[in-house]
Design a protein with these regions (language model features):
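Extracellular/lumen-exposed scaffold segments
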Residues: 1-163
Length: 163
């Protein structure tokens, strides 16, 4: 056994753990900032989607932001007569969280009765209640079209660590 303080340089086991935890928290913050960043849509990439976790007194909500290139639209609801794909949001939470229904803004009628679209930027909210911590993932899917063509269906998954 060696006598001496545990905190000698090179023996700072507690500090190393704190540094690892700090690095993990910093990495989570960078990931959250990247997920929240909005990329400007272009003709070749007409829809960009970003998401961020917004905490509140009951738990929080995922705020999903869609930005659309001028002239394109995405579908909110699709009539059985139309072949399009509507916006989907699939959220996975750990047991103990209570997942609310996604809150969409009003969409405008388009073509066939029963089909509605968004043709400008919009935000969807997904409320989640619970005081627990843990991972939450949210997969967002959509199809965009302009007056000449439709893009293949697309999706993106966002992951958050709730603390």
């Amino acid at each position: 056994m060696i006598d001496g303080p545990v905190s000698l340089p090179g023996n700072d086991y507690y500090g190393a753990k704190s540094k690892r935890e700090a690095a993990a928290i910093a990495a989570e913050k960078v990931l959250a900032e990247q997920q929240a960043r909005t990329v400007v849509p272009t003709y070749n990439n007409p829809v960009t989607v970003s998401a961020r976790w917004v905490p509140d007194e009951k738990g929080g909500q995922i705020e999903i932001r869609f930005e659309l290139f001028k002239g394109f639209h995405v579908y909110r609801e699709v009539s059985e007569k139309d072949p399009y794909i509507s916006v989907t949001i699939d959220t996975e939470v750990l047991q103990g969280f209570q997942l609310g229904s996604a809150i969409f803004p009003p969409a405008r009628p388009f073509g066939t009765p029963g089909t509605t679209v968004y043709d400008d930027a919009f935000t969807v909210l997904v409320p989640i209640e619970g005081k627990l911590s843990g991972p939450v993932s949210c997969t967002v899917g959509w199809q965009s079209c302009d007056d000449k063509m439709c893009t293949p269906p697309q999706s993106v998954t966002f992951r958050f660590m709730i603390r």
